[in-house]
Amino acid sequence: MAAQRDDEAGWSAEAARRVWGGAVPLQVHLHDADVTTLPPPPPFLTLGPRIGYLPLLVPIIKAHFSSTLPPGIDTVWFEYKGLPLKWYIPIGVLYDLLCADPERPWNLTVHFRGYPSEILTPCDGEDSVKWSYMNSLKEAAFIITGNSKNVMNMSQADQGALWQSVMKGNLDGYMNISTRLKLGPFEEDCLVRTSSVEGQQGSDEPESPGSGKPCRVPVRLYVRSVQEDLYDLEDALPVGDWESISYINRPFEVRREEGRSYITLEHALKTLLPEFFSSKASRIPDDSETAPQAPDSAPNDDSDVTPRSCEKLESSASSSPQEANVANKGKIVKLVRVQGIEVDMDIPFLWVANNLKNPECYLHICVYVGTRKREPKDGR
């Protein structure tokens, strides 16, 4: 039975390859304000890697539209139905979050001028995306092992090779380097070997998952509200602004409970989002904090993720629902998506964490909640 639980929670090479090979079909339109020729150019069709980022597609998109672009310095950004897209959120997460009913191809608009700096943080192309990725990896390492030294001590060559593997979707190259960071896989028996923890207390070596202390899984939650009486997700109103999306960083600590063979995704979500899983809240029907913020500045290769910075990161986990800007009254969970999959709530959570995480070691979960219409008060 124990071996069976290990299999249920363990890492799957096939699942990892499917995640790394996943892509969103994109149809990119050039905004009318950037068109300088007639007739206007046709849209550009491409595949956006789920684990990739929109700015990394700019070189091939610009090549397609180059003959019609206005002169001047490019300030490239993307929008979907009027919403500027956060460049540091993976393409797959943006798609799962903003397309309630999957749209194929996903129609995006690209702008080469008029960057909305009041909404989006600056992006200087690949370098900005790389620093954002490395910073997230350091944060994840701190959550998992208690410090970020394993990432900080990477050589420049290894950092470059790791980033190239992410950009090119090279899972084998990624695994060759990432396994040295000791950031996974998470194991069901990670709570039992306490003696090894005592032996490491005086050491600066990072603890790998399974070293005896509770596993801590880096999780990013994106909570979107839709109409509760929505019959078909294709009728969901589009997201008008990022303030309507609740973004929550809540590391999940795996604690074994007596009588529980493994922790399900439902159990994890009840812990991560108790405001939506109260005794009166509903499960996902069978039939069917604020906007995310980029780092204030791009960290350099020598920057560390300190306990103080991670205290800020983990503050969401201990904050009240009000502080997270999530109003739980009159809301029920309607849909949960991870890597484009509407996940069964009974699936082992550690299997999801091990196999559906992104290359920066965060598990991104999109949650749709139905909002009930408020009943008018008597006489009003």
Swiss-Prot record:
UniProt region (Disordered), positions on chain: 194-215, 283-309
Compartments where located: Cytoplasm
Highest taxon above the source species: Eukaryota
Coiled-coil residue spans: none
Tagged with keyword Cytoplasm: yes
Cross-link Glycyl lysine isopeptide (Lys-Gly) (interchain with G-Cter in ATG12): residue positions: K138
Family matches, as Gene3D superfamilies: 3.10.20.620, Autophagy protein Apg5, helix rich domain, Phosphatidylinositol 3-kinase Catalytic Subunit, Chain A, domain 1
A single GO BP: piecemeal microautophagy of the nucleus
PTM comment text: Conjugated to ATG12; which is essential for autophagy.
Recorded GO MF terms: Atg8-family ligase activity
Keyword Ubl conjugation: yes
First-listed, main subcellular location of the protein, grouped into a coarse class: cytoplasm
Signal sequence segment: none
Keywords: Autophagy, Cytoplasm, Isopeptide bond, Protein transport, Transport, Ubl conjugation
GO cellular component: Atg12-Atg5-Atg16 complex; autophagosome; mitochondria-associated endoplasmic reticulum membrane contact site; phagophore; phagophore assembly site membrane
A Pfam family recorded for this sequence: ATG5_UblA
Residue ranges with Polar residues bias: 194-203
UniProt record similarity statement: Belongs to the ATG5 family.
Free-text function comment from the UniProt entry: Required for autophagy. Conjugation to ATG12 is essential for plant nutrient recycling.
Subunit relationships: Conjugated to ATG12.
Name of this protein: Autophagy protein 5
